[in-house]
């Protein structure tokens, strides 16, 4: 099969121009092109339609498309900016940009808040935090007693709920997260800064074979 130059990326792949995505995110053009290779692998793992479905997202995270996990579901829902049940390439790049090492801390804090705000009410309630703690433990294959989980929730609210109204608002979350940077360690993926090293340079420089699109 023939090959197309990176200038034909948008037309051939029917995805947004890498230059536009680079301008709107922390990624460079070459990093966006490298992410397209990753996007293709994920979006063709099950349905092969050029879109990432929840099962493919689960498979990429856990090597298991049937594993139920609130954490993975929340990440998928936040990546699905158009709320249509799938993730296209533009959504993939824009959302993944949050995890870039050079993305401002404030953006990471805001994303983490939305992650924990399960009901979308604009605040984090005790039940939501409890559910997310359990999900994160499950994702890490860790087990804590219910009493230990409640202690984590209690301590978090004791430190974060400054006005003691039983919920954590965005400003309280920002203050709490700024004082507890370990809370955001999962909001940074160091390899994204070196994503261009993952794939062959000839792919990044100019060519993507049509048979892979």
From Swiss-Prot:
GO CC, one annotated term: plasma membrane
Membrane topology: Lipid-anchor
Domain EF-hand: 31-66, 67-102, 104-139, 148-183
Pfam families reported for this sequence: EF-hand_5, EF-hand_7
Positions with a binding annotation for Ca(2+): 161, 163, 165, 167, 172
PROSITE patterns: EF_HAND_1 (PS00018), EF_HAND_2 (PS50222)
Entry's Gene Ontology molecular function annotations: calcium ion binding; kinase binding
Subcellular location: Cell membrane
Gene3D superfamilies: EF-hand (1.10.238.10)
Tissues where this protein is expressed: Expressed at low levels in roots, shoots, culms, leaves and young spikelets.
Factors inducing expression: By drought and cold stresses, and abscisic acid (ABA).
Main localization of the protein described in the UniProt heading: membrane
BP term (GO), one: calcium-mediated signaling
Cysteine pairs bridged by disulfides in the record: none
Residues at the site labelled Involved in dimerization: 140
Keywords in alphabetical order: Calcium, Cell membrane, Lipoprotein, Membrane, Metal-binding, Myristate, Repeat
Lipid anchor positions (N-myristoyl glycine): 2
Subunit structure: Homodimer.
Family indicated by similarity: Belongs to the calcineurin regulatory subunit family.
Job description of the protein: Acts as a calcium sensor. May function as positive regulator of salt stress responses. CBL proteins interact with CIPK serine-threonine protein kinases. Binding of a CBL protein to the regulatory NAF domain of a CIPK protein lead to the activation of the kinase in a calcium-dependent manner.
Protein name: Calcineurin B-like protein 8
């Amino acid at each position: 099969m023939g090959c197309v130059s990176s200038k034909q990326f948008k037309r051939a792949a029917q995805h947004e121009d890498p230059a536009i995505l680079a301008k709107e995110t922390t990624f460079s053009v070459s990093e966006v092109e490298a992410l397209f290779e990753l996007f293709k692998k994920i979006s063709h793992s099950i349905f092969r339609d050029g879109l990432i479905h929840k099962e493919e997202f689960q498979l990429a995270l856990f090597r298991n498309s049937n594993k139920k996990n609130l954490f993975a579901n929340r990440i998928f829902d936040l990546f699905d900016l158009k709320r249509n049940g799938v993730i296209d390439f533009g959504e993939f790049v824009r959302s993944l940009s949050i995890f870039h090492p050079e993305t401002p801390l404030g953006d990471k804090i805001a994303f983490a808040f939305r992650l924990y705000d399960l009901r979308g009410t604009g605040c984090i309630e005790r039940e939501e935090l409890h559910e997310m703690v359990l999900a994160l433990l499950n994702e890490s294959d860790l087990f804590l007693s219910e009493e230990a989980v409640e202690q984590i929730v209690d301590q978090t609210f004791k430190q974060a709920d400054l006005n003691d109204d039983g919920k954590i608002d965005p400003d309280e979350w920002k203050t709490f997260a700024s004082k507890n940077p370990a809370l955001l360690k999962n909001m940074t993926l160091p390899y994204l800064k070196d994503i261009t090293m993952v794939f062959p340079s000839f792919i990044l420089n100019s060519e993507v074979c049509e048979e892979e699109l």
